[in-house]
Amino acid sequence: MAKLSPLTLIFIAACLSRILQLTILSGLSKALPLFDTSPSLLLSSPPPALRWDAIHFASVAYNGYEYEQQVAFQPGWLAVMRLAGEGVRFIRAASVVELKDVILGGTIVANVAFVAATLVLYKLTKHIFNPTFAFLTSLLYLLPPTATPSAPYTEPIYSLLTFSGIYLLSIKRQMVLAGLCFAGATTIRSTGIFNSITLMCFAVFGDAHIFDLDPKDYCKIRKKLKPFLSAILVVAPFFMFQHYTETVFCTRELKRASTARPWCSNSPPVSYGFVQKLYWNVGPFEYWTVSQLPNFALAMPILFFSLAGVVKFFSHLVSSSQVLNHGTEEIPPPPILFELYSVHVLTMALLLFTSHTQITLRVCLGDPVVWWNAVKLGFDNVQIGEAPTGQVKVNKFGRYWIGWTVVWGAVAAVLWAGHYPPA
């Protein structure tokens, strides 16, 4: 019998994880009454996928943007859900697409995207680190502390586009295709604009380490147009959508009647920050209240591993840049990691200081650094290189991470099925 490749094993495991979680959620949704009946506002018998933000996604994908609070969501995923719903309608030979088609189509795409994202993460990690490190990363990725990979949520397809962009950029050197993937990620989630940092830094530094650059090189950067064009490509979808919201909510008629929304008078008239703060209580330290301490506690494992991983990485980066001074042979990390860790720091800071911090549990799906940190800190004898030096063993941090993701993943499935908080 032929031995299966690691990539094939990851594919099988990813598919089984989707089947298992979907089956569990289906069973739980039949056994548990809804704590919050919001899903019933759309369908009398809502499927287990229709919970929390999926309610908004399905509504906009089916009816379009109707209310101001809905513009907090980028249009990319909603368009994909609508298109997938049309596909379901076509398969069942119906004349009109129904809401349940949109929900089912979105659920299918999200689950397929999660499997694909896992495979791309493996290939990306294999090239940056080594096959063993990549295999461990992928296995941990299949134990997410959230039920959202089984629902029509933004995270699976955002992760696929982000991982694909990083892979195309750092491994295949396809800057245009990478930029398109990153731009696609921005149409899904506004945090996709952070990928412009990765693209711009790669355009500037290439394979050079930031500490190896001569001061004269920085002067040359200002004369280069390519890095800035790359960044514009990635952030363009966000500002294009802001322009769309302006044309809808800031018409001349509304301004003359003094009924235009307050943000219409801003310069520029950007709705995003206003809507996030008014309807979702998102803003600097808005979430820092005593009542939200349990939600901070939920995200603490990821935040802890992120802090420890960031300190370890940048310490390694600085020490490896001083090889000549110390007379050591320490291997510096691949240049692309500097950009990715920088984006990781910005993402974690955003989640900690301005967002609903517990969404870290699902946003982490689109950040490869989270999973690399988990492997680096949770396993002994794993590092950058061709192969591990010695037997790879899980340590106490690894046991804690795996135990936490398994236990909380199970709890999250129950909470999701019954539409219990936290979201």
Curated annotation (Swiss-Prot):
Compartmental location: Endoplasmic reticulum membrane
Phosphoprotein among keywords: no
Membrane topology: Multi-pass membrane protein
GO cellular component, one term: mannosyltransferase complex
Broad EC category: transferase
Keyword NAD on entry: no
Sample GO molecular function, one term: glycolipid mannosyltransferase activity
InterPro entries: PIG-V/Gpi18
Function: Mannosyltransferase involved in glycosylphosphatidylinositol-anchor biosynthesis. Transfers the second mannose to the glycosylphosphatidylinositol during GPI precursor assembly.
Official protein name in the record: GPI mannosyltransferase 2
